[in-house]
Amino acid sequence: MGGGIAYALARKFPGLEKAYRVFIKENCAYEYSNDGWLTKEYKTGSMLGKIHLFKACDDLYIANVFGQNDVSSRSRQTSYDATVEAFEVMEKALQEEALKGLPLYFPYKMGCGLGGGNWQIYSAIINLYFPEATICQLPT
């Protein structure tokens, strides 16, 4: 949660980053280094394809989609297959009573900045699983 949209959301919603770290600790062998970065053990872990749901308020949940293990400006780190797997998990989660009927929002170019993904591919995956979703782009 040190960059991009995750960083902005963590600043806006106190408790998100702590809940995220607890989720990772419970679901994958990892440690945070003294500077707050995940160690290499996590980067080879099995978080790909999972989601972490955080209740920000009564009618807003934030879903962390684990579609990449690392960031790089030189090569693609995002996994389209892992994103599809996570979306399938999210699709099932959205059937729960507390989540039914809530609007869905996805950040524009999700997985494309530090993850190196292709937005045309990502937007097609989003539209396939969640055609009713709104893509949000912050003004620059």
Regions found by a protein language model. Name each.
Residues M1-T140:
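Macrodomain-like recognition of ADP-ribose-binding/processing modules
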